[in-house]
């Protein structure tokens, strides 16, 4: 059996790690012993935060909606209840966007929700 020297393979693997570690601080970008665990940890954070991002944005939309419905004499929970009772099925992301970019449209929706609560 012929001998296999691992120079080419090792170089390719290291190059892959260095590419992922680009922009890291200090030895973590140019020493394989420091770069490898740093890249692994970065990937763990990325995986975790892709899940967390969804929660964070939903919380942001809820905060924005709560702030937007207060001038109409509603709280967020009463607003959502009113939407359900009036049969409006628009998600929080779109509602939040409406509240910021189209206040008149959002006001109409808020008034409908308020009317559904009163009825």
Curated annotation (Swiss-Prot):
Biological processes annotated in GO: ribosomal large subunit assembly; translation
Q: Which GO terms describe its molecular function?
A: rRNA binding; structural constituent of ribosome
* Recorded GO CC terms: ribonucleoprotein complex; ribosome
Q: Which UniProt keywords apply?
A: Ribonucleoprotein, Ribosomal protein, RNA-binding, rRNA-binding
One Pfam family name is Ribosomal_L20
PROSITE patterns the UniProt entry points to? RIBOSOMAL_L20 (PS00937)
Record keyword Secreted present: no
Q: Which InterPro entries match?
A: Ribosomal_bL20 (IPR005813), RIBOSOMAL_L20_CS (IPR049946), Ribosomal_protein_bL20_C (IPR035566)
Top-level taxonomic group: Bacteria
Q: What does this protein do?
A: Binds directly to 23S ribosomal RNA and is necessary for the in vitro assembly process of the 50S ribosomal subunit. It is not involved in the protein synthesizing functions of that subunit.
- Similarity comment text for this entry: Belongs to the bacterial ribosomal protein bL20 family.
Full protein name: Large ribosomal subunit protein bL20
Q: Which organism is it from?
A: Bradyrhizobium diazoefficiens (strain JCM 10833 / BCRC 13528 / IAM 13628 / NBRC 14792 / USDA 110)
